[in-house]
UniProtKB/Swiss-Prot annotation:
Protein family (similarity comment): Belongs to the SpoVG family.
Keyword Cell cycle: yes
Lineage: Bacteria, Bacillati, Bacillota, Clostridia, Eubacteriales
Protein name (Swiss-Prot/TrEMBL): Putative septation protein SpoVG
Gene3D superfamilies on file: Stage V sporulation protein G
Gene name of the encoded protein: spoVG
Keyword list, A-Z: Cell cycle, Cell division, Septation
HAMAP family associated with the record: SpoVG (MF_00819)
GO BP field: division septum assembly; sporulation resulting in formation of a cellular spore
One Pfam family, short name: SpoVG
Task of the protein: Could be involved in septation.
InterPro entries, A to Z: SpoVG, SpoVG_sf
Amino acid sequence: MQITDVRIRKISSEGKMKAIVSVTFDNEFVVHDIKVIEGQNGLFIAMPSRKTPTGEFKDIAHPIVMDSREKIQNEILSAYAKAIEEQDVEEE
């Protein structure tokens, strides 16, 4: 499965959540609401989730193979860095 599009839908400079992203696979399947989060060890992604009645968050969709997760994260963080760079250029 190939990542064919990454769309940074919302960018925030405040708080730990830095962006909300949609990723398209093979021009056929899209996953919305992936979050870019700033943690203690740098940026990472959080897959879309919902809150259970007990207050726990459960992923709605997520990769089950570590290599796939790393590939998705690398693509998203690369697109996020590019979007931030373009935003900085526009502000100058």
